[in-house]
From Swiss-Prot:
Superkingdom field: Bacteria
Biological-process GO terms, alphabetical: CTP salvage; UMP salvage
Protein name as annotated: Uridine kinase
Residues annotated to bind ATP: 15-22
Organism: Yersinia pestis
């Protein structure tokens, strides 16, 4: 059993790609950190746990279906969550969107009272759900997600508009319908309109603040 001094609350935030879940996670982290200090709260992006593909050629890497659960190293993520709950620090992996594989460097994370976990496929894995104290699904219409994704991937990740659209049609939308949307049933809280839903963010802040009392 986890020592009380090391108890770690895990909050999962899931939803479609570009649904606004990262914005909600970063807003909650920033505003709660101002209240309690960064020694008590941390964020783990699921994106960092894409499997290492350094053994594959670039041609093979770009063919990976990044919206399928098999693309994720959830075993490592689970191991890290359990380590944090046991009061042990972890080295978070980082992922390169331009090289399509894991970076060599990592980010050191000490145990925190609250960890915000965010990613598209979190709720598809029962083992991860069992580690969460509660979970959130950001429910944003797919057409809005597509527009946001195109803007983000072209401007921030060096992608072409054609490649973003092709990936959306081939894997992003089908995988959302097959895996991500059905996982919404496991969420404790549904947040519409993404990161612009200030009322929802304030409610979530109040809920999370209870764990610091």
């Amino acid at each position: 059993m986890t020592d009380k001094a090391h108890q770690c609350v895990i909050i999962g935030i899931a939803g479609a790609s570009a649904s606004g879940k990262s914005l909600i996670a970063s807003t909650l982290y920033r505003e709660l950190r101002e209240q309690v200090g960064d020694q008590h709260i941390g964020v783990i992006p699921e994106d960092g746990y894409y499997k290492d593909q350094s053994h594959l050629s670039m041609e093979e890497r770009v063919k990976t279906n990044y919206d399928h659960p098999s693309a994720m190293d959830h075993n490592l993520l689970l191991e890290h969550l359990q380590a944090l709950k046991a009061g042990k620090p972890v080295e978070l992996p980082l992922y390169s969107y331009t090289e399509h594989t894991r970076k060599k460097e990592t980010v050191h994370l000490e145990p925190k009272k609250v960890i915000i976990l965010e990613g598209i496929l979190l709720l598809t894995d029962i083992r991860l759900r069992q580690e969460m104290n509660f979970s959130i699904f950001v429910d944003t219409p797919l057409d809005i997600c597509l527009m946001r994704r195109m803007k983000r991937d072209v401007n921030e990740r060096g992608r072409s508009m054609d490649s973003v659209m092709a990936q959306y049609q081939k894997t992003v939308r089908p995988m959302f319908l097959q895996f991500i949307e059905p996982s919404k049933q496991y969420a404790d809280i549904i947040v519409p309109r993404g990161g612009k839903n200030r009322i929802a963010i304030d409610i979530l802040k109040a809920k999370i603040s209870q764990f610091f009392e």
